[in-house]
Amino acid sequence: QPLMEFSGACEGCGETPYIKLLTQLFGDRMMIANATGCSSIWGGSSPVTPYTTNECGQGPAWSNSLFEDNAEYGYGMYIANRTKRQHLASLVEESLAKNVGSDSLQALLNDWLEHMAEGEGTQQRATKLAAALSEEADEDPLLTKIYEQKDLLVKTSQWIVGGDGWAYDIGFSGIDHVLASG
């Protein structure tokens, strides 16, 4: 299901079909760093938004940056999320090493750890693990810490969106920096 609808963009706009497709593929775990431009007008004009959620209340997270800083802004979002998830992984590793929780919870923690870098199936693994953690989190402070960070169980899909002026001219040095960073 597309998680972008009723954008209010100009008739024939070439940007919206791409974003609609991205939301169909990644929308329930998508983070968008948007450069100021047309997409900030049709994508974030208060009091409405074209983005919506699925039946579980999951949908794209959209944020807008200054025109020239968007590549760095989006890259910063990615790095911050990656760092938080690495910390969560260290907590999961510690809980597995200490044999904390039931066998079924340990199996779910191990499965999450093995697949934490994969987008495919991340929502399903996160849902199962969060449910199991909710039942056992009070039994150990380490499980409580993991459960408190359950929003990080899903691997996000980070997107940096901008127009041609941003990509070819004003924001090029930022794009170059992000690409050079790997």
Roles of regions detected by a PLM:
Residues 1-182:
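Cofactor-binding active-site loop characterized by glycine-rich and histidine/acidic residues
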